[in-house]
Swiss-Prot record:
Gene Ontology molecular function, alphabetical: imidazoleglycerol-phosphate dehydratase activity
Name of the protein in its database record: Imidazoleglycerol-phosphate dehydratase
Localization per record: Cytoplasm
Family in the record: Belongs to the imidazoleglycerol-phosphate dehydratase family.
Pfam family, one: IGPD
Keyword presence, Cytoplasm: yes
Amino acid sequence: MRAFKVTRDTNETKIHLELNIDGTGKYAITTGIAFFDHVLSSFAKHGAFDLKLDVLGDLEIDDHHTVEDVGIVLGKAFENMEKKNIKRFGWAIIPMDEAKATVSIDIGGRPYVVGGYTPNTEKIGNFSTENVVHFFESFSNNAKINLHFEVTGENEHHKVEALFKAFGVAMDMATQVDERKGIVSTKGVI
């Protein structure tokens, strides 16, 4: 079983995460940011990851540190995963009403993010939309994953939710075990 626990305790956040990559999509997420909980739940459900996340952040300031540090901790959990026999690449195109999100991933040990997301509104509830790209940067840098994404649409809720669903589906695909694969790199290491 590929299950990991990661804790982060700083002056800005206190986070405890439990991730089972080979889960069934069960989740219990409490970040203090309702919409962020919602999209992380969508990530877990559509990625079939069991995810438990308890966060106490400095939300009296704003949501930046909480969103950033969740990306860091989730990234570290995936970085701990054994890379031998994984499919390595994953992608998804997910519609949600008028919105469409595309995500492609390479679990190749090289963090890099190319993101096409321009928010039409500053907030969805108490979630700052400017933090969407920052979440994916924090995740990628700590998971050492190359991540490309694009999203179009009018409704901000639909755009961000479609993006997190696509992220879950693509990560599920890339983390699947295929015993034929070995290390999927001509270098022999990831």
